[in-house]
A protein has these predicted regions:
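N-terminal alpha-helical targeting/anchoring segments
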Residues: 1-3, 8, 18
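Charged, amphipathic alpha-helical regulatory modules used
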Residues: 2-5, 407, 628-629
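Long, intrinsically disordered low-complexity tandem-repeat segments
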Residues: 646-684
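Conserved catalytic cores of very large enzyme subunits
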Residues: 29-409, 430, 436-599, 605
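Intrinsic-disorder-associated, low-complexity terminal segments enriched in Asp/Asn/His/Tyr and depleted
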Residues: 9-11, 15, 677
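Intrinsic, low-complexity terminal and presequence regions
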Residues: 572-647, 680-689
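Conserved phosphate/anionic-ligand binding catalytic regions in large, soluble enzymes, centered on
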Residues: 160, 407-424, 599-618
Length: 689
């Protein structure tokens, strides 16, 4: 298949919206006397396209609404993005990004991507330590501890592009509940204020801070005998003595998140991650609350530690483990939008795999060679970004990051993939896809090839690399839009008006309505990623009961080796009646009450947009096209009856799954043999589609 001609970019739909000719060769970071030609940003177009909403990037991020703050971020971000591309990255990286061979994420932010922080350090030291800024003593009460957490996450969010995470929320806050003898109502009030405060759009661009909390449920072994400090003073008990207080905190958090806001909307943040270990109690009163919340809104991520060689407490020692052996790929920890303590990601680059399949149709060897070239470019950009950001940390440009982190040594450089299903379709002339055995095998070979390349990069650079199923919320539409313009014959998902590529190595969104078939087909692919990855079980409406939801999650995690899982029911919000199950564009209750002569009352339809919940109306063009094509999973019959009465659900057990080839990553969901399992019956019956 012939490649489309490479052209100088004046395309206003390119990621930066700036145009100039192909730049001359230049050093990676050009000195002042050898700077490349300046990039001209058209101020009229920049402002007017935002005000008119004629630029699709206005809605690229569903967490950022059309607003004055959004305009300021859009305009400033365009300048910063062009600075990265024209003044920091070499011409070949700039060209690859502008032309859509790859996507360098977060170009509009002069900072790192995501970070996990030590909540224990914050609670023991108090939020401060930055000269000239307000300092707080170590908190003595739950409300002040939660207030400092809000301030910390909001402040650090302004120094990073992506998610900010705390681990062991329930374990580390339990001493404050014990110390003050707080009642359930007092704990609930404090947690309610905390959750509401985290959902205020206080971040640049009128965005809500993107936050993640991991909850332990039971005290991790590494903290069990540790003595907490409250207000800087040791307590007469250990963390292991505080299960009752942990239960109170979990109960309060679950009740607040289930209730939603004053209009019945789900809280988008913090994204809660629950650690499912061998001793996870599936039948406690809090488990009932957890699965009632999951059945209604589908908010949590479930992190699968069943059969794993890691434990939840490892998030506190991961920063020590990361440097042990650069010949091994390690997991970042805590899911797609979480990071273990003092780790995270410096930056992310996603590769347009669909285009590779088209340009190298029928020649897998040529595809892998081209992939190698893009990996080299991605690594070049990530090494340069690490150098620039670390230098600015050292100079105090990010004062709170310098105080609470200091070094990016334990942060990963992240490379991701997009459109593997379309890659296989284009490579095979549409004979194969991820739904066929051979297409599945091709995807595995590509991921294994990438894993081997990342090991080589670690050894060559001395820096950590990981492979991520990047969310690519905006990049998937940008890739498809650019490819449709350049390669009219390329195979894509969506329509002419709303093209997109299937995310990472996921199944096509309309392939099956059987969640267990999807789990069976995905577990081997999911296990290849060492950065973030998750399998979302999109449902058309709320799960029929908490018991059925519990059994769905339990069966998925114990029988399939997927590292992370969500249950994602679609729901709607009526301005009068609040929460409505399922996709309801207009409110049926209002129609009944108002009579046939009244106009319809429009509802907000909510679901997950690659990791977090937002109204579908706020999705970008590509994600709206994906939502329109999605076939929701049906709830398997008999889940509630199989779960049995309360108290009888089985405890967690090691899953049975298929083994990934190549170097086995440390982390959730390791591989093992795959015995026959009734939950897989749909997969065997379906065959290759």
């Amino acid at each position: 298949v012939p490649a489309a001609p490479r052209t100088a970019h004046s395309d206003p739909t390119s990621d930066t919206g700036a145009g100039r000719g192909a730049p001359p060769a230049a050093p990676a970071v050009a000195p002042d006397d050898a700077a490349r030609p300046p990039v001209v940003v058209d101020v009229r177009t920049t402002v007017q396209e935002y005000l008119d909403r004629s630029d699709w990037r206005v809605a690229a991020n569903a967490n950022q609404g059309w607003s004055l703050g959004g305009l300021v971020l859009s305009a400033a971000g365009k300048v910063v993005a062009n600075w990265w591309l024209s003044q920091v990255y070499p011409p070949e990286v700039e060209r690859a990004h502008r032309e859509g061979d790859l996507h360098v994420h977060d170009l509009d932010v002069l900072g790192g991507y995501c970070a996990g922080w030590s909540l224990r350090a914050l609670l023991e030291q108090g939020f401060g330590g930055v000269p000239g800024r307000v300092a707080s003593r170590p908190p003595r009460h739950l409300t002040s501890a939660l207030g400092q957490m809000v301030n910390f996450l909001g402040t650090l969010q302004n120094e990073w592009a992506g998610a900010q995470a705390f681990s062991s929320f329930d374990t580390l806050l339990a001493p404050f509940v014990r110390r003050d003898g707080l009642s359930p109502d007092a704990v609930r009030q404090a947690v309610q204020e905390f959750v509401h405060d985290l959902n205020v759009p206080s971040r640049w661009g009128t965005q809500t801070p993107f936050t993640n909390l991991t909850l332990d449920w039971t005290c991790p072994d590494d903290l069990r005998d540790a003595v907490p400090l409250v207000g800087g003073e040791p307590c007469p008990f250990t963390y292991g003595d505080l299960q009752a207080e942990m239960d109170l905190l979990n109960r309060a958090f679950l009740e607040v998140m289930t209730e939603g806001d004053a209009d019945g909307r789900a809280f988008t943040f913090p994204i809660p991650t629950y650690n499912v270990t061998e001793g996870f109690d599936w039948t406690s009163p809090n488990a009932d609350r957890l699965f009632a919340m999951t059945a209604r809104y589908g908010l949590p991520y479930f992190q699968n530690f069943l059969g794993s060689d890691l434990r939840p407490g490892d998030v506190r020692s991961m920063c020590c483990r990361l440097r042990l052996d650069l010949r091994e790929l390690l997991r970042r920890g805590n899911g797609l939008f979480g990071s273990a303590e003092q780790t995270g990601s410096v930056g992310v680059v996603t590769i347009n795999c669909a285009r590779l399949g088209y340009l190298h149709a029928g020649d897998e060897g040529a595809l892998l060679a081209a992939l190698d070239r893009l990996v080299d470019l991605a690594a070049t950009s990530l090494e340069l970004k690490r150098s620039v950001v670390q230098g600015l940390v050292d100079e105090g440009f990010y004062p709170y990051t310098r105080r609470w982190l200091g070094s990016l040594e334990n942060h990963f450089s992240t490379i991701g993939v997009n459109g593997l299903h379309e890659m296989v379709r284009n490579l095979s002339g549409d004979d194969e896809g991820l739904t066929t055995p051979e297409g599945h095998a091709v995807a595995l070979r590509v991921l294994d090839h990438l894993r081997a390349r990342l090991v080589g990069l670690q050894e060559a650079t001395g820096h950590l690399y990981n492979l991520e199923a990047t969310p690519a919320e905006g990049a998937t539409y940008r890739f498809a839009k650019e490819d449709r313009r350049r390669f009219p014959g390329i195979r894509q998902a969506g329509t002419d008006a709303r093209p997109y590529y299937t995310n990472s190595s996921q199944l096509p969104v309309g392939f099956t309505d059987d969640p267990f078939e999807a789990l069976g087909r995905q577990e081997e692919l999911q296990g290849r990623y060492t950065g973030g990855t998750v399998l979302h079980l999109y449902l058309g409406e709320a799960v029929s009961s908490p018991e059925a939801c519990r059994e769905l999650v339990r069966r998925a995690l114990t029988r399939f080796r997927v590292p992370y899982l969500t249950v994602t029911p679609t729901f709607s919000i009526c301005p009068t009646h609040g929460y409505l199950a399922g996709e309801q564009p207009t409110c049926p209750r209002c129609a009944d009450e108002r009579g046939p002569g009244a106009g319809p009352v429009v509802c907000e339809v909510w679901t997950r947009v690659m990791g977090y919940h937002r109204p579908v109306s706020s999705f970008n063009v590509g994600k709206q096209g994906e939502h329109a094509e999605r076939v929701p999973f049906r709830e398997p019959e008999g889940l509630a009856s199989e779960a049995g009465p309360a108290g009888s659900a089985p405890t967690g057990s090691a899953p049975t799954g298929s083994a990934p080839a190549g170097p086995a990553p440390a982390g959730p969901a390791p591989a093992g043999p795959a015995p026959a399992d009734p939950a897989r019956a749909g997969l065997a019956a379906a065959g290759a589609r």
